[in-house]
Amino acid sequence: NVTYDYNTINRTVTININQPGKAFKFPLSIDVYEDFGKNSHNVWVEGAQSSFTFPFSKLPKLINIDAKHVLLAEISDKKTLENYLYQFNNAPHYLDRRLALEEIVKEQKTNKEAYETVIKAFNDPYYEIKVFALENIDLFQKYNKKDAIVKIENLAQNDKNTLVKAAAISVLGKLIDPIYKPLFERGMNNESFAVIGSSLTSLYQIDKSSALNKLNSLTIDTKESLSDAITTIYISENDKTNLPFIAKHVLNGMFLTQNPRTQQLYGEAFKWIAESDNKEAISNLTDDFV
């Protein structure tokens, strides 16, 4: 646990490190950011309680604990949104931006700078941050979404990373706009299963008939590679003729996703299987349990 005591008269900040449970001795890197840049400090933490005092010229914009990201420890550090915004824009490492973005996305509904920072993350050099930003962008808040959509369209069409492209297609699919139908249909011809899956799901949102025709034309092996997307469509269609296929994948949707809507959808399908006399479906479900 990390807390801060600021002395504005002496212009110092004291950083208090509290180790609950067993205490360890370890080196710790601390970066203190002010308007002119950062001061880096390397200290040793010893015992359950340790404190370190550093001077500052102006109140720090950010204090970054474990700045080198080498500790295998959970750090509880109460930062403000302003701290996280500064961290995303100024701290040098991938983890700095990723950890900051995880907090920033929570505030985008009510804070314009937070929303604009999520959009800025679309340009990050790391594809993982791009994907996280796309998966968490909120296009249904009060701020102008036009610029965001233009950037997402560009990623969906041109990004070299297929996971980024797939995530961008999924975002556009949530808009349920027929203008994107050609994009989704082209995505069905991509070599990446991630892109095909997101394109199929997005196409289903705007043209169920076309999506089902595409789905039915797929080979068995391809369907298995697109199991998440296809299982969701089968369940949404209340298609019990494909109960054996659904049974192979229903547990993944129930337990390996954090999406409550998906969990509920797959939970209903589980009931179908449990109440059915479809021996193949029950066998597939049992095999998946083992």
Could you describe each region identified by the protein language model?
Residues 69-73, 95-109, 120, 130-143, ...:
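Structural detector for internal amphipathic alpha-helices that build alpha-solenoid repeat scaffolds
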Residues 254-265, 285:
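Non-catalytic carbohydrate-binding regions of carbohydrate-active enzymes
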